[in-house]
Amino acid sequence: MKVVLFCGGLGLRIRDAEDIPKPMVQIGYRPILWHVMKYYAHFGHKDFILCLGHRADVVKNYFLNYSECVSNDFVLSGGGKKLSLFNSDIQDWQITFADTGINSNIGQRLKAVEKYLEGEEEFLANYSDGLTDLPLPQQLEHFHQQDKVASFLCVRPNLSYHMVSLEEGNENLVSGIHAINNGTVRINGGFFIFKKKIFDYIREKEELVNGPFQRLIDERQLIGYRYDGFWAGMDTFKDRQHLETLYGGGAAPWEVWKANGNGRREVDVAKESLLSSSVG
């Protein structure tokens, strides 16, 4: 199944990332976009469509100059001329790079790549700035059982705010207070599944949630998949710090692919840009 990833937004609220696409903000050695792609690839979905916008060159150049050595163990021999990787990240990925406009919204970006989804009855999509350990096949099974046009992940917000209840008739008297993530509030966590019919609901210049989703709701064609496992978005510098802490401590729940290895394979050192630049 193809995976549409929205990569055109800015990281304005993330320190030192104001001028790059937010999905290119790094978690460990790789951008969060890579972590999202690894998640989907783990479940067999390796055909990606990247909806590019602001600083599209950053995304393109990252993959054009991709080095497997950064995130994989390897053996260097033959005086630096022979490289054997124990694992490979993107060898079997197919990536379509689509410029979808500098200031386009999500609805416009999705509509712009409709032509690359020809023949697909359904597809996956993601904001590319959130991570989860969700067993994706479970969400897909739920989607197929419900037989609706669209589905997205419904998660509890990871916020430090508290929900406050005020007593009726006395708006100054607090009747309850609790952490927002302990209540009944759920938010749109992304991780969309769409039938191709979604394009019938998108009008020109409409944001995905404001227009198309409202029409889907009116026709009872939008479902949410409730998930209480790990989910974390990256909207602020604090969010990034949290993900970096999990990654650095070896407890990154979203790395569902960690148990799988692809075996050792030989690589042309000249094609490994990071290695060739450091070995001389």
Where are these regions (language model features)?
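Structural beta-sheet core signal
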Residues: 3-5, 50, 125, 150-153, ...
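Short beta->alpha linker loops
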Residues: 28, 54-55, 101, 156, ...
